[in-house]
């Protein structure tokens, strides 16, 4: 992320992403969602999304069968299938989810960005 993009995040979330001591993972579900948005003209990327994620030093977290199964069994607080996969990943992998989407709160996962 560049400085202007980090400034749009909450201060704690931006600081966590900028801190090189942290391992930052991007869900394969997020990459899929971004690719769909690019394909329909909602986002522009000058290079492949995976290459951009890796250039930032982030790791890609694959979606597993366990993630998908867990996502399918989640309560319907949030209906977006991509976000449900990300919630399941955060839960099963015991990761902190960086998000500014308040619809993630009812799932009891650790979040950063909703301060």
Question: What does each model-found stretch correspond to?
Answer:
Residues 1-26, 39-51, 93, 102-106, ...:
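Short, well-structured N-terminal submotif of metal-dependent ribonuclease cores
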Residues 44-46, 50, 55-103, 114-115:
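Active-site neighborhoods of divalent-metal-dependent phosphate/nucleic-acid chemistry enzymes
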Residues 34:
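Phosphate/NTP-binding elements of NTP-utilizing enzymes
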């Amino acid at each position: 992320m560049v400085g202007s993009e980090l400034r749009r995040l909450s201060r704690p979330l931006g600081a966590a992403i900028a801190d090189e001591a942290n391992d930052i993972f991007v869900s394969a579900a997020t990459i899929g969602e971004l690719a769909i948005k690019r394909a329909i003209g909602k986002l522009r990327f000058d290079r492949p999304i995976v290459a951009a994620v890796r250039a930032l030093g982030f790791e890609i977290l694959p979606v597993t069968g366990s993630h998908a199964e867990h996502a399918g069994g989640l309560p319907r607080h949030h209906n977006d299938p991509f976000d449900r996969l990300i919630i399941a990943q955060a839960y099963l992998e015991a990761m902190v989810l960086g998000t500014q989407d308040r619809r993630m709160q009812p799932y009891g996962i650790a979040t950063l960005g909703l301060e």
